């Protein structure tokens, strides 16, 4: 790591996230003057242009890649058109102990005076909550599910190689061509297309102006700079910012800066849920890297330094703050920019290059909160690359996670993607996959599957709140067979899935109508060709996911009921319901019996695994094929981020012996402490699921550091990954940390400020996590042997 990178890394690590009201003030002033004067797409594009013209430009000392979303690093914009924070929200964000965002009293007063009055009644969040059905609100408040889009925009996507092939001026030419060819006589949508295409062209202008302002600042700084080396760097930065993004990049440095301007544009236009990522960044940069080496204008060390600068830029972009239930289910500074490394090319060949190794080394050197990193390991991936990745995993940062292109390509093809588009896809966000540069996909929020069983056991009533939240499917005390119970559970699944689909489709329409993403649309096929927005059927593929959570908990709970109530009749249903309602008070003998005598998921046990397969398949059948608003359909995902902790807080105890308020299992991982036969048994259980039916499955594993001490241990880890992927596994990730270290970090947080752990699809600083989430990580089974 160079001295420059050490300084930039430390500055980024030390920076305190803050709230900037600059964007909100510019936007509010613009809307006050212009709302109603233009069609909404053009209004949104002109608003973006105004922000790019007026926002503060920042270039830090030592920086080689330039540009920030806010006026300085880790200054987070607010987006009042989506969620207009109240004064109380701002005070809470400024004073809370965890995930604090500083904001001055002067800014709070200005926000209260200038921003809040205008946006009252105009926000997307109000449009959603003022129009959803009463039964949806009650289920939402009970913790049956969450909704991502209630305060953030759908921007969950990744880019492809177009970013490096076309500059903004090229895109404007393509837009002009489409405008000239509009058929106003025979195409009833021609006027709508004209508005959208015009808005896209304005967005191109905005990006060029934004970069030009960086060039001007760099030149001014160069004029004042006394250090010859830095003066030369600033002049080079100015030159690059005058070329990209107006034109396609010519060099490695320009290519990174090109992407960064595009990235900043998308997260400035709207706060898309899970910031975009550059797709197969190593593959896109490889031609530039190789050509620059050949021309003698770049060394490997310089390429790595530029990559490090890029990583630090991502770390500077703290996630916009969340409030309400969304804050409870996803409380983190991490904005989920996840870098795909390795994998396969569009033609199916090995995609690993020297840039892949540079990225992996940068992950190891910096080990910052962001970006996340994901190794893509196909059957054609070189063993050396996997071994180098395992060396980084061993360090205990919680990343990189590991993905299987051989499975996710089949997932994407099953959804209707071409083989080429599927191979060009990969991970965006946590563990979900999409077709890079060609797909808009919406994550609608999480479904609490164990809670659905809890409601089933109480005949449609939530036992925590006492409110009726669902159908009456019968008193389970009267059920004579396991099949009767499961049929009731299945009816409840369909009820909540259908409720979620109904409201998700309404929310989609609200974004298409009120918040088009005209800048993001520039980079997604086939928005320009169709003349349609990213949110309104413009992309080639338009996918909607429902993320199901708690497979381990629901499997183990059903296993308890099937075996001990209906088959062996050790307990009756009344005893189980009473025990879960009273948190097993006075029933420790029952808990121990359940622990020691129940087949649990994650142990390669056919009894439990058959239940998991049935639940997985029935969730798929309930969700798959439900139509969305864009002519395509809903699909199944199996992940949780941190929502499994929130969901657990909303539940009583469950039949599998889990106590009230404790987290349910995450993604498709086994329940904490249930996987007692080692990681090989875990992956065998998971391998029995037909994961190609999903759009992503999450598997967490925790290893003691002693398990990976020797080089031969790394070979065993690599073999475990290969074995799981041969069984059809989609994803696996590891925490390499012992329990003593985690307890020490709780007692002495000041000594463990940079302790990163894997949460669920992302890594976080252990001491930025609340106590419940810390406990969740500690409680995971610590594997001591393969």
Residue spans of the language-model regions?
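Short, Lys/Glu-rich amphipathic helical modules
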Residues: 218-234
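Extended non-globular scaffold/tether segments
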Residues: 198-209
């Amino acid at each position: 790591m160079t001295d420059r990178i050490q300084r930039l890394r430390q500055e980024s690590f030390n920076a305190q996230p803050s709230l900037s009201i600059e964007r909100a003030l510019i936007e509010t002033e613009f809307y006050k003057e212009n709302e109603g004067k233009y069609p909404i797409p053009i209004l949104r594009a002109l608003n973006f242009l105004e922000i790019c013209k007026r926002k503060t430009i920042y270039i830090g000392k030592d920086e080689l890649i330039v540009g920030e979303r806010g006026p300085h690093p880790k200054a987070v914009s607010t987006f009042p058109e989506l969620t207009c924070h109240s004064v109380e929200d701002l005070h809470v964000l400024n004073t809370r102990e965890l995930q604090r965002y500083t904001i001055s009293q002067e800014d709070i007063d200005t926000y209260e005076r200038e921003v809040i009055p205008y946006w009252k009644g105009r926000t997307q969040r109000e449009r959603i909550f003022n129009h959803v059905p009463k039964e949806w609100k009650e289920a939402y408040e009970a913790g049956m599910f969450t909704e991502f889009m209630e305060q953030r925009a759908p921007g969950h996507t990744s880019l492809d190689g177009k970013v490096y092939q076309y500059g903004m001026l090229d895109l404007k030419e393509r837009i002009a061509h489409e405008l000239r060819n509009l058929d106003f006589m025979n195409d009833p949508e021609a006027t709508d297309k004209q508005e959208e295409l015009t808005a896209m062209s304005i967005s191109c202008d905005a990006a060029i102006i934004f970069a030009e302002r960086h060039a001007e600042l760099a030149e001014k700084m160069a004029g004042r700079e006394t250090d010859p080396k830095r003066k030369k760097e600033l002049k080079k930065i100015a030159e690059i910012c005058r070329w990209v993004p107006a034109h396609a990049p010519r060099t490695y440095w320009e290519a990174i800066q090109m992407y960064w301007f595009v990235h900043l544009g998308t997260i400035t236009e709207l706060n898309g849920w899970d910031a975009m990522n550059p797709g197969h960044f190593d593959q896109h940069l490889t031609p530039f890297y190789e050509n620059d080496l050949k021309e003698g204008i770049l060394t490997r060390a310089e390429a790595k330094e530029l990559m490090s600068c890029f990583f630090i830029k991502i770390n500077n972009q703290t996630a916009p703050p969340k409030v309400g239930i969304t804050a409870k289910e996803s409380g983190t500074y991490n904005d989920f920019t996840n870098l795909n490394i390795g994998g396969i090319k569009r033609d199916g060949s090995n995609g690993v290059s020297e840039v892949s190794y540079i990225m992996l080394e940068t992950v190891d050197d910096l080990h910052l909160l962001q970006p996340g990193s994901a190794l893509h390991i196909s059957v054609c991936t070189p063993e050396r690359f996997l071994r180098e990745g395992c060396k980084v995993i061993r360090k205990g940062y919680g990343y990189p996670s590991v993905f299987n292109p051989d499975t996710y390509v089949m997932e994407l093809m099953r959804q209707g993607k071409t083989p080429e588009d599927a191979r060009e896809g990969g991970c965006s966000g946590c563990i979900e996959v999409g077709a890079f540069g060609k797909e808009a996909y919406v994550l609608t929020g999480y479904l609490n599957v164990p809670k659905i069983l809890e409601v089933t056991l109480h005949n449609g009533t939530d036992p925590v709140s006492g409110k009726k939240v669902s159908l009456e499917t019968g008193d389970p005390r009267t059920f004579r067979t396991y099949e009767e119970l499961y049929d009731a559970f299945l009816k409840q699944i369909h009820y909540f899935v259908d409720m979620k689909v109904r409201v998700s489709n309404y929310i989609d329409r609200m974004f298409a109508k009120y918040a088009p993403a005209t800048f993001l649309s520039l980079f997604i096929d086939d928005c320009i060709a169709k003349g349609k927005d990213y949110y309104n059927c413009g992309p080639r593929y338009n996918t909607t996911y429902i993320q199901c959570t708690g497979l381990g908990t629901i499997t183990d709970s059903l296993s308890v009921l099937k075996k001990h109530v209906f088959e062996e009749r050790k307990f009756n249903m009344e005893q189980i319901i009473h025990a879960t309602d009273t948190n097993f008070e006075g029933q420790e003998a029952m808990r121990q019996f359940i622990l020691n005598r129940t087949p649990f998921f994650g142990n390669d046990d056919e009894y439990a695994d058959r239940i998991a397969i049935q639940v997985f398949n029935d969730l798929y059948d309930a969700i798959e094929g439900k139509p969305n608003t864009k002519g395509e359909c809903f699909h199944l995902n199996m992940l949780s981020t941190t929502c499994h902790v929130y969901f657990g807080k909303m539940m009583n105890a469950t039949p599998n012996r889990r106590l009230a308020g404790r987290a349910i299992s995450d993604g498709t991982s086994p329940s904490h402490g249930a996987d007692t036969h080692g990681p090989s048994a875990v992956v065998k259980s998971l391998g029995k699921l037909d994961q190609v039916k999903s759009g992503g499955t999450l598997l967490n594993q925790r290893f003691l550091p002693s398990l990976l001490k020797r080089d031969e241990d790394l070979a065993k880890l690599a073999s475990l990954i290969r074995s799981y992927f041969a069984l059809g596994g989609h994803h696996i990730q590891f925490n390499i940390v012992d329990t003593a270290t985690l307890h020490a970090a709780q007692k002495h947080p000041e000594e463990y400020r940079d302790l990163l752990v894997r949460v669920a699809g992302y890594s976080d600083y252990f001491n930025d996590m609340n106590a419940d989430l810390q406990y969740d990580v500690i409680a995971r089974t610590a594997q001591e042997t393969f």
